[in-house]
C-alpha cells in the first residue's frame, strides 16, 4: 500500500458503525484518496461499540499493539474526533498550485465533540502526550524522552497519491 516508507503520509480513519452499508462503517483515506477495501476485509457489525470510544474502560495505545509490537516510524499529529465521521477534507486539501499534492490543514476550526476526542500535536517536548483539543484527554508517554522529539522543519510535509 505504501510505496515509500520514508515519505510523509496523511492517513484518516473515518468510523461510523451506525451506517447500514457495511463498507461505509470504516473508511480509510491516504493522502486525500479513499482506499477501497477488498472483499476479504471484515467490517464491524452495525452499531458495534468499538474499544477506542469506550471512555474510562479502555485506554488507546498509540504506536503500540499487544504489548510488544511497536511502531517504527514518526508521527506528526494525531487527532481523534468522537461522535462524527469526518472525511479527509476535514484534515487536509489538495494544493491549488499542484493538484497532485495533498497537504495538511490548520485544525483550529475543528469541533472536538464527545468525551474521548483528543488532538496530539507533539509540539511540547516536555509533554508529548498533551491533548491540545481542549478536552483534557492527555496521554501518558512511556519509553520516550524529550530528546525523542524530532522538530518539523515544515518542508516536504505533503503526500502524493498512494496507488
For every predicted segment, state its role.
Residues 50-75:
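Extracellular glycan-interaction patches encoded by glycine-rich segments
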Residues 4-5, 53-55, 71, 109-114:
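Extracellular/periplasmic catalytic domains that process cell-envelope and extracellular macromolecules
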Residues 15-17, 66, 124:
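Short beta-strand segments enriched in hydrophobic/aromatic residues
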Residues 20-22, 33-44, 74-141, 145-158:
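Extended recognition patches within non-cytosolic domains
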Residues 13-18, 163:
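Solvent-exposed strand-to-loop "edge" motifs in beta-rich extracellular domains
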Residues 43-51:
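Beta-propeller and related beta-repeat scaffolds in trafficking/envelope systems
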Amino acid at each position: 500500500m505504501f510505496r515509500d516508507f520514508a515519505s510523509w503520509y496523511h492517513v484518516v480513519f473515518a468510523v461510523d458503525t451506525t451506517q447500514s452499508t457495511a463498507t461505509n462503517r470504516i473508511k480509510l483515506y491516504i493522502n486525500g484518496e479513499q482506499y477501497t477495501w477488498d472483499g476479504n476485509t471484515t467490517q464491524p457489525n452495525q452499531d458495534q461499540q468499538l474499544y477506542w470510544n469506550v471512555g474510562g474502560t479502555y485506554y488507546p495505545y498509540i504506536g503500540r499493539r499487544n504489548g510488544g509490537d511497536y511502531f517504527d516510524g514518526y508521527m506528526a499529529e494525531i487527532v481523534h474526533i468522537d461522535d462524527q465521521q469526518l472525511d479527509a477534507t476535514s484534515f487536509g486539501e489538495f494544493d491549488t498550485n499542484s493538484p497532485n499534492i495533498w497537504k495538511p490543514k490548520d485544525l483550529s476550526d475543528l469541533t472536538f465533540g464527545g468525551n474521548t476526542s483528543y488532538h496530539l500535536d507533539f509540539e511540547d517536548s516536555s509533554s508529548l502526550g498533551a491533548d491540545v483539543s481542549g478536552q483534557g484527554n492527555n496521554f501518558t508517554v512511556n519509553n520516550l524522552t524529550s530528546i525523542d522529539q524530532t522538530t518539523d522543519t515544515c518542508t516536504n510535509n505533503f503526500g502524493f497519491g498512494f496507488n
